[in-house]
């Protein structure tokens, strides 16, 4: 510990606190450091070590492990999970072997599927699996620079914020752009008028998706024009774009039906092929006709189509994932000493309601909230009680059955979640 020199109180060379304000002051050859600054340095070094460890560890995950981890959270999208697992593995190889970065191009992904099928969840799950920063943006809010709306650089700012402004970590993050189909140009032919929220946004996204040194305003670009910009290399960022692309099945059907014209052509009813079968025939030209410019599609080499969820898939989503909705509510009831039981028929009824509303998996929570709202309001008074949800309760908006907990022998069958 440092001592007073010439009866003058010594101070830390870093925080300038004198020795009376700190517990210990350590002397060096030409200065002093206090115990608080030492603790701060240790914390910063540990955080940096964890960050570097996380970045290096994820590269060792093989595609099969990534695939299994996705399927633990996302139900009914095995093919899309396999495609994404390979794409992320290629990205990991590029991180581990930087000399291959110029030789092996990154695999930006385009996810196509109806609302509520799990596009956003897959992207979020991927970021958690490989432990990298994740940011999400809505394409409908983006405009070209200089117009009212959000600049594309703000997407990178969100990723930087998710990485706690650690530029090195942010440069290896994942950006998910939702509703990408909403920035399709209005017609297949180039327009002579300015399309600042459609084709203009696609043009603005080209550079950052391909890889460039982006100048990111840390406080947002338009309200603080005098601020200093942060330089971020987007070369190693993985971009995942998702959209429902409503109506693209008609474009695919029109193309495929033209190739089977003639006396020997098989006449098919519109009901012969479902949505999932039609999407399996998707080609890049179909997306161009929908309104995505060829240059933009060129930055999205990997295209994965997600299946429309059927009744059984929705029932599985309710019970099978690690964070399944039924498990979440059962845990909440358990914390208050109550037991929540869903009969099998009740789960089917919930899935049928979601299908009728065409909200996919996204609508399941809203239905459960509606069924359990009054019961949750009185949950603190339901200790040692059993709450049973039947199909009739779900279909007719009735109150759940509440009764004292029964012995295992006489208890109704509980859904294994």
From Swiss-Prot:
Keyword ATP-binding in annotation: yes
Pfam families the UniProt entry points to: AAA_2, ClpB_D2-small, zf-C4_ClpX
SUPFAM superfamilies with a match to the protein in the record: Glucocorticoid receptor-like (DNA-binding domain), P-loop containing nucleoside triphosphate hydrolases
GO MF annotation, one: protein dimerization activity
Entry binding sites for ATP: 114-121
Alphabetized UniProt keyword annotations: ATP-binding, Chaperone, Metal-binding, Nucleotide-binding, Zinc
The organism's place on the tree of life at top rank: Bacteria
One GO cellular component, as annotated: HslUV protease complex
Binding site for Zn(2+): 12, 15, 34, 37
Domain ClpX-type ZB: 1-53
GO biological process, one term: cell division
Family of the protein in this entry: Belongs to the ClpX chaperone family.
PANTHER family, sorted: ATP-DEPENDENT CLP PROTEASE ATP-BINDING SUBUNIT CLPX-LIKE, MITOCHONDRIAL, ATP-DEPENDENT CLP PROTEASE ATP-BINDING SUBUNIT CLPX-LIKE, MITOCHONDRIAL-RELATED
Task of the protein: ATP-dependent specificity component of the Clp protease. It directs the protease to specific substrates. Can perform chaperone functions in the absence of ClpP.
Oligomer and partners: Component of the ClpX-ClpP complex. Forms a hexameric ring that, in the presence of ATP, binds to fourteen ClpP subunits assembled into a disk-like structure with a central cavity, resembling the structure of eukaryotic proteasomes.
Protein name as annotated: ATP-dependent Clp protease ATP-binding subunit ClpX
Organism: Orientia tsutsugamushi (strain Ikeda) (Rickettsia tsutsugamushi)
């Amino acid at each position: 510990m440092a001592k007073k020199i010439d009866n003058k109180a010594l101070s830390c060379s870093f925080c300038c606190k004198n020795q009376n304000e700190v517990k210990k002051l350590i002397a060096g050859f030409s200065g002093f450091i206090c115990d608080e600054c030492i603790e701060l340095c240790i914390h910063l070094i540990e955080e940096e070590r964890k960050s570097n460890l996380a970045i290096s560890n994820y590269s060792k995950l093989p595609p099969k492990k990534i695939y299994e981890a996705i399927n633990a959270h996302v139900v009914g999208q095995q093919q899309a999970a396999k495609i994404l697992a390979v794409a992320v593995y290629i990205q990991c190889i590029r991180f581990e072997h930087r000399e291959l970065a110029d030789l092996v191009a990154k695999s930006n992904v385009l996810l196509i599927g109806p609302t509520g099928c799990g596009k956003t969840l897959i992207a979020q799950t991927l970021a958690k699996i490989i432990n990298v920063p994740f940011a999400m943006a809505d394409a409908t809010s983006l405009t070209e620079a200089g117009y009212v709306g959000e600049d594309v650089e703000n997407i990178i700012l969100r990723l930087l914020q998710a990485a706690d402004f650690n530029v090195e970590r942010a440069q290896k993050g994942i950006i998910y752009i939702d509703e990408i189909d909403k920035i399709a140009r209005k017609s297949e032919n180039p327009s002579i008028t300015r399309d600042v929220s459609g084709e203009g946004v696609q043009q603005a996204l080209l550079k950052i998706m391909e890889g460039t040194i982006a100048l990111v305003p840390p406080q947002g670009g338009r309200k603080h024009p005098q601020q200093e910009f942060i330089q971020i290399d987007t070369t190693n960022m993985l971009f995942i774009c998702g959209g429902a692309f409503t109506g693209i099945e008609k474009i695919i059907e029109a193309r495929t039906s033209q190739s089977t014209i003639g006396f020997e052509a098989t006449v098919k009813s519109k009901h012969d092929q479902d949505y999932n079968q039609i999407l399996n025939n998707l080609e890049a030209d179909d997306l161009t006709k929908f309104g995505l410019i060829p240059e933009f599609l060129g930055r999205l080499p990997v295209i994965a189509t997600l299946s429309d969820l059927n009744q059984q898939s929705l029932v599985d989503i309710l019970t099978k994932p690690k964070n399944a909705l039924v498990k979440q509510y059962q845990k909440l009831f358990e914390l208050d000493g109550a037991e929540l039981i869903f009969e099998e028929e009740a789960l089917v009824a919930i899935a049928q309601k979601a299908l009728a509303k065409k909200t996919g998996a996204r609508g399941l929570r809203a239905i459960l909230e509606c069924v359990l709202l009054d019961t949750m309001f009185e949950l603190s008074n339901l200790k040692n009680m059993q709450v049973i949800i039947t199909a009739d309760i779900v279909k007719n908006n009735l109150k759940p059955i509440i009764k004292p907990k029964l012995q295992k022998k006489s208890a109704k069958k509980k859904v294994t979640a």
